[in-house]
């Protein structure tokens, strides 16, 4: 006698113990639904299977073959003689970019079909469980009502998920795949073909000719991220404490003045600062007029000066954000602890060290991690302020103040080295993801949340 089938029964057991229509549903999708008079649902499953196999033969197999080879015939020109006249004609060839994209799209299409196939098996199992328990098999209208009520959220997510697959997952996988090809300025598509080269691009970045650029930029990127995050966090808290000092007059006015920088678009502030700090800008002109300097200070043209200038300008932009968050936290701190500490004779510094700062850090720890990762990928400050300059002849397609993310941009737009840019993108993600996980799981915010 066959065992009872439930909605959680493993599919291997369902195939072994199931009825003939359930077993055949593993080969012919929707058969169990058709046998149980769910004609609409069964036909949809069956048509999905037929459409997949037709597409598999006509489109998917050639697309997967093209993704493996990335093309065999280059586009070019040939001489053709017509009525004794030699003409130059274009020779059609393969496009490695399109072959890779179509191949990846075919894999995603196969994954979607695999999910539909799994839904077919779950439906067959559910029908058998209903029949064994003596319950009524719902028709299509009743199934649709269930979808519109209990699983309405799944229906709403269908179109967004398709959009995510097409416009997020597919480009992301495409970018990752480029890291394993030789798609660079020597192999410009579609004119030339590029090939799979394995991990050679990673070796070129980490050990080859690019290592002399990658590791100095990685070091500067981490220094910048730490300095930018720490300065805006510390001085933002200090400013918030000053603005919340008892007896300070015109608090709202002072707070508004500091928040004005937030109202100005960031790129506008950065471009203004770029003009303000250049060799012939207002600041250097003022310093020379006052005879404080003999010549212009290279705020943006000397590597060391430029790095300090970037950090200070970022403080100007970032401190007000931290000040606002810290102000909200300080205004909602329990006053009982602070008053008790004051009665016990604690100084303001001791109160800040033992009460105020720990509670601010507890609340802002996730935000700090986010700011650090954001600064690793802070494209705007570098691009609009220095453009990555000043130039450095020892670097490949990078300047002295370039971050990894701005270097990635130059490798893509200027150098056309898409494979190397893809490698840099993967390494940036690995660094950011590793730090985020390690920092967050060790933060007090995570430990307190996990303890609840």
Q: Which role fits each region the language model picked out?
A:
Residues 2-14, 19-21, 27-35, 39-42, ...:
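N-terminal signal-anchor/first transmembrane alpha helix
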Residues 17, 49, 74-77, 81, ...:
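Glutamate identity and glutamate-enriched acidic tracts
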Residues 45, 49-77, 359-360:
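A compact, surface-exposed functional segment
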Residues 59-67, 121, 152-452:
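A structural signal for multi-pass alpha-helical bundles of membrane permease subunits
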Residues 70, 75, 84, 136, ...:
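Helix-loop-helix
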Residues 72-89, 190-191, 391-398:
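Intrinsically disordered, low-complexity coil segments
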Residues 76-108, 207-219, 298, 303, ...:
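Membrane-interface segments at the starts/ends of alpha-helical transmembrane spans
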């Amino acid at each position: 006698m066959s065992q009872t089938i439930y909605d959680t029964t493993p599919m291997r057991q369902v195939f072994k113990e199931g009825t003939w229509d359930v077993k055949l549903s593993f080969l012919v999708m929707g058969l169990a639904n058709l046998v149980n008079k769910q004609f609409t649902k069964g036909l949809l499953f069956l048509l999905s299977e037929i459409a997949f196999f037709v597409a598999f033969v006509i489109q998917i197999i050639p697309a997967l073959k093209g993704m493996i080879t990335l093309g065999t015939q280059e586009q070019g020109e040939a001489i053709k003689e017509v009525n004794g006249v030699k003409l130059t004609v274009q020779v059609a060839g393969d496009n490695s970019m399109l072959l890779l994209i179509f191949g990846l799209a075919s894999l995603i299409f196969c994954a979607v079909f695999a999910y539909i196939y799994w839904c077919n098996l779950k439906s067959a199992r559910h029908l058998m469980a209903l029949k064994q328990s003596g319950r009524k098999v719902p028709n299509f209208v009743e199934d649709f009502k269930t979808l519109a009520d209990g699983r309405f959220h799944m229906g709403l997510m269908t179109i967004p998920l398709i959009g995510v697959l097409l416009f997020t997952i597919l480009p992301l996988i495409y970018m990752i795949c480029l890291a394993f090809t030789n798609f660079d300025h020597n192999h410009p598509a579609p004119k030339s073909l590029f090939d799979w080269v394995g991990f050679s691009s990673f070796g070129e970045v980490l050990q080859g000719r690019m290592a002399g650029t990658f590791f100095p930029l990685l070091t500067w990127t981490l220094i910048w991220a730490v300095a930018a995050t720490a300065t805006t966090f510390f001085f933002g808290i200090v400013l918030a404490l000053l603005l919340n000092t008892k007896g300070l007059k015109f608090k709202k006015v002072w707070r508004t003045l500091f928040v004005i920088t937030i109202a100005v678009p960031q790129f506008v502030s950065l471009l203004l600062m770029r003009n303000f700090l250049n060799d012939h800008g207002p600041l250097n002109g003022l310093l020379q007029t006052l005879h404080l300097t003999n010549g212009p200070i290279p705020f943006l043209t000397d590597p060391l000066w430029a790095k300090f200038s970037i950090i200070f300008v970022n403080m100007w932009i970032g401190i007000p954000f931290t000040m606002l968050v810290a102000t909200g936290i300080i205004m909602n701190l329990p006053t009982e602890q602070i008053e008790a500490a004051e009665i016990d004779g604690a100084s303001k510094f001791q109160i800040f060290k033992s009460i105020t700062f720990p509670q601010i850090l507890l609340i802002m720890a996730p935000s700090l991690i986010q700011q650090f990762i954001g600064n690793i990928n802070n494209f705007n400050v570098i691009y609009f302020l220095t453009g990555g300059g000043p130039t450095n002849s020892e670097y490949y397609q990078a300047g002295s103040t370039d971050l990894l993310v701005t270097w990635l941009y130059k490798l893509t737009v200027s150098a056309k080295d898409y494979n190397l840019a893809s490698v840099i993108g993967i390494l940036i993600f690995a660094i950011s993801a590793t730090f985020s996980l390690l920092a967050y799981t060790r933060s007090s915010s995570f430990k307190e949340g996990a303890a609840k």
